[in-house]
Amino acid sequence: RQPEYADFRWNCETLYCVEEFWKQASEEDRADFARFVKEGKIGISANYLNFNDLVNADVFGKRLAKWQDKLQPFGTKIHTAMAADVNGFSMGYRDAMIENGVEFFFTNVHCHHGMYPLYQNQNAFFWENASGQRLLVWNGEHYNLGNVLGLQPNHAVNWMMRNRLGE
């Protein structure tokens, strides 16, 4: 309600937190939540939890389909998935997202747990399945651009930042 916050957007990093809210919310709260999603004031990630690369793709796909069905009567759906600190995803995970209408996958690889694919971070690519369907992926690092832009206070410059900044 304050003009200086008009462009603020809350992002639910995982579907689990949305599911827990939904369990205790009134019908009015659910409708308000869905309206905020539709208006772009709340973002919902298709990612259920930030587990690891061994998530069961069938279970994930069924859970995601359930949520797309729940949001459909409100005139909205989940288009984007965001994952943090998970350094790999299966082709089945990709297919579950594609099959359930997810178009964009934003991933933040945690370099303390492993390294970026082909040692390249902060780049985009299309992840294509055998039938030619594609998912647009942003391959970022933990804190996304926060380290490179210096948004993390008192953070020592590391070799990855120097490399990214061309120093």
Label every model-predicted segment.
Residues 1-167:
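Catalytic-domain carbohydrate-binding cleft regions of carbohydrate-active enzymes
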